[in-house]
Amino acid sequence: MGIGPVKAIPKALKQAGLQQKDIDLIELNEAFASQSLAVIRELGLNPDIVNVNGGAIALGHPLGCTGAKLSVQLFDEMRKREMKNKYGVVTMCVGTGQGAAGIYEFLN
C-alpha cells in the first residue's frame, strides 16, 4: 500500500504519450483515505474526476480483484457519460509500497 500511484501514474502517462490534462476519469484504489489524499495532493489531481462513484473505502476492494473491479467501474462510467470522457486511469496500490496504473481509451 502507500502512495505507489504517485510514481506509477506519470510513468504510465509517459508510456502512453499522454499528459495528466488528457485524463478525464480516475479510479484510485485506496485502503485508507490518507492514501487518496496524498496521491491527489502529490500529483495535483482534480478531485472532481477521482472516484466519481465512491472509492474502495465505500465500495470495497476485494483482494486480488482490485484492477478488474476498478477497470469495470471506469468502463461503466465512461459508457454512462456517452464518450464525453475519452481517457481514464485505474491505479492499484500493492503491498510494500508498490503501485500500478493502467490507462484506458474509450472507443466507440
Show which residues each predicted segment covers:
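Claisen-condensing/thiolase-fold acyl-transfer catalytic domains that form or cleave C-C bonds
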Residues: 1-108
